[in-house]
């Protein structure tokens, strides 16, 4: 059935292959490392000569393919007939297309098998002939990564230890400050206790003194009592019964009551003194306690201030050390920069001196070349004068030449100031065996002039170098009738 003029697109899971034309099949495999081009007509593998399979990575492409669009180009005469045939015979068309698809799939499978065999062979050849480009550094990479991990862990551990050391130093500073505060407080308490002991000793001494005074007073009272009784007894014994005087007087004073009163007075005095002393002692103790509490509070405040000041001092010392290190680094950088720029300046100075020397040499060379150019211009003018002179001489001597066909040569020479050497040669050409009359027109004559230029370089009156250059020059003179 005729299927011209229709366009059919069929989806498949295999790569496309055109059965009627040349189509390149590109296969990609995840475990292969090369691309292989296979033509469907000849089934030949195209690889460059002298090159193996290169280990360049292959681009991965999904194994799902779309068969390309097949266009069947109809003839202009059969367009309507083809469209009618397709519309009327769809089943036959689909059957034909399915048969073609089956044959196409069989060819694709065959080509895939051949391509796989060729890839295996190429892989074997490449594995046999492929040189080792570079050693395997994977083990070293793993070792390097492990060492880098260890280095990072060590750095983290070092930073943690440094932070712990700093914290320990701060805690030690706090404990040292607390110890010093407690030590100063203990010293103050010991000083207060020593003062109180001294006060207690003074009070015990005053108490003992008062007790001694009371005892001495009681002893004195007893002595007075005994003396009084003795005096009374002695007076009674002296008087006896001789005098009996009745005296109406005031009743006698009871010494016991008086002594009792005195004792009560002294005891009250002692009690008042004791109370006064106790009150004074209590007031002193309260004042001392208040002073101790206030001093302890002030000391704690001072200790806190001291701790804060020490922390501030430590932070300032750290900052000062950092500033010192920064200053040292900046000084080193400045010194390096100065040294680098000094070296660069020296290089630039040397380059400037070299350029100045080159400029001076170029100027001297230009002056020398200018002088040589002037000399050469002078030589050129003289040579032109000489050439004109020789030309005039040749023209004047032309009438004197013989008429027979023979070759004559005339070589005049001239030397001017040992710098130029000219050798003109006059030649006239004639053929042997042919005689011409004198008045016949002959061939043109050629004059050979040799220009010898001697260049001498003179310095301080001495010839340094000398160069000689010989340049031939031909002058053509037309023949005269």
UniProtKB/Swiss-Prot annotation:
Region annotated Coil 2, chain positions: 254-397
Disordered: annotated span: 1-25
Biological process according to GO: epithelial cell differentiation; intermediate filament organization; intermediate filament-based process
Annotated segments matching region Linker 1: 126-136
Keyword check for Coiled coil: yes
Signal peptide per UniProt: none
GO molecular function terms attached to this record: structural constituent of cytoskeleton
UniProt-listed InterPro entries: IF_conserved (IPR018039), IF_rod_dom (IPR039008), Keratin_I (IPR002957)
Region ranges (Tail): 398-481
Region Coil 1B, residue ranges: 137-237
PROSITE patterns: IF_ROD_1, IF_ROD_2
Annotated region described as Head, given as residue ranges: 1-90
Record site: Stutter: 339
Region Linker 12, residue ranges: 238-253
GO annotation, cellular component aspect: cytoskeleton; intermediate filament; keratin filament
Swiss-Prot/TrEMBL keywords: Coiled coil, Intermediate filament, Keratin
Domain (IF rod) ranges: 90-401
Chain spans, region Coil 1A: 91-125
UniProt similarity note: Belongs to the intermediate filament family.
Self-association state and partner proteins as the record states: Heterotetramer of two type I and two type II keratins.
Function in brief: May play a role in late hair differentiation.
Other comments on record: There are two types of cytoskeletal and microfibrillar keratin, I (acidic) and II (neutral to basic) (40-55 and 56-70 kDa, respectively).
UniProt protein name: Keratin, type I cytoskeletal 39
Source organism: Rattus norvegicus
Top-level taxonomy: Eukaryota, Metazoa, Chordata, Craniata, Vertebrata
């Amino acid at each position: 059935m005729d299927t011209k003029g229709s366009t059919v697109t069929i989806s498949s899971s295999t790569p496309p292959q055109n059965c009627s034309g040349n189509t390149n099949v590109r296969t990609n495999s995840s475990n292969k490392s090369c691309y292989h081009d296979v033509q469907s007509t000849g089934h030949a593998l195209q690889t460059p000569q002298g090159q193996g399979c290169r280990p360049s990575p292959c681009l991965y492409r999904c194994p799902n393919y779309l068969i390309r669009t097949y266009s069947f180009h109809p003839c202009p005469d059969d367009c309507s007939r083809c469209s009618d045939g397709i519309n009327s015979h769809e089943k036959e068309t689909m059957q034909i297309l399915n048969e073609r698809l089956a044959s196409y799939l069989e060819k694709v499978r065959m080509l895939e098998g051949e391509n796989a065999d060729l890839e295996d062979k190429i892989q074997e050849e490449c594995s046999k002939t492929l040189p080792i480009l570079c050693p395997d550094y994977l083990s070293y990479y793993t070792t390097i990564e492990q060492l880098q991990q260890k280095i990072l862990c060590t750095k983290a551990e070092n930073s943690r230890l440094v932070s712990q050391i700093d914290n320990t130093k701060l805690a030690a500073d706090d404990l040292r400050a607390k110890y010093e505060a407690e030590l100063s407080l203990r010293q103050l308490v010991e000083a207060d206790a020593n003062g109180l002991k001294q006060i207690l000793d003074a009070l015990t001494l005053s108490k003992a003194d008062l007790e001694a005074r009371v005892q001495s007073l009681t002893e004195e009272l007893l002595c007075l009592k005994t003396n009084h009784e003795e005096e009374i007894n002695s007076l009674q014994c002296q008087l006896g019964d001789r005098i009996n005087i009745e005296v109406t007087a005031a009743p006698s004073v009871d010494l016991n009551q008086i002594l009792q009163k005195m004792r009560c007075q002294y005891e009250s005095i002692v009690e008042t003194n004791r109370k006064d002393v106790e009150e004074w002692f209590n007031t002193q103790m309260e004042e001392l306690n208040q002073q101790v509490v206030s001093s302890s509070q002030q000391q704690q405040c001072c200790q806190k201030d001291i701790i804060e000041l020490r922390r501030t001092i430590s932070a300032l010392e750290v900052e000062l050390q950092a500033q010192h290190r920064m200053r040292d680094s900046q000084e080193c950088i400045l010194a390096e920069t100065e040294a680098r720029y000094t070296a660069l300046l020296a290089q630039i100075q040397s380059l400037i001196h070299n350029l100045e020397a080159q400029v001076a040499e170029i100027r001297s060379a230009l002056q020398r070349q200018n002088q040589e150019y002037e000399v050469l211009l002078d030589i050129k003018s003289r040579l032109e004068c000489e050439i004109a002179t020789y030309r005039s001489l040749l023209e004047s001597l032309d009438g004197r030449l013989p008429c027979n066909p023979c070759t004559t040569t005339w070589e005049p020479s001239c030397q001017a100031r040992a710098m130029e050497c000219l050798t003109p040669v006059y030649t006239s050409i004639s053929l042997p065996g042919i005689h011409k009359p004198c008045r016949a027109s002959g061939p043109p004559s050629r004059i050979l002039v040799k220009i010898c230029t001697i260049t001498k370089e003179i310095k301080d009156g001495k010839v340094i170098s000398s160069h000689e250059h010989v340049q031939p020059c031909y002058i053509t003179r037309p023949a005269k009738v």
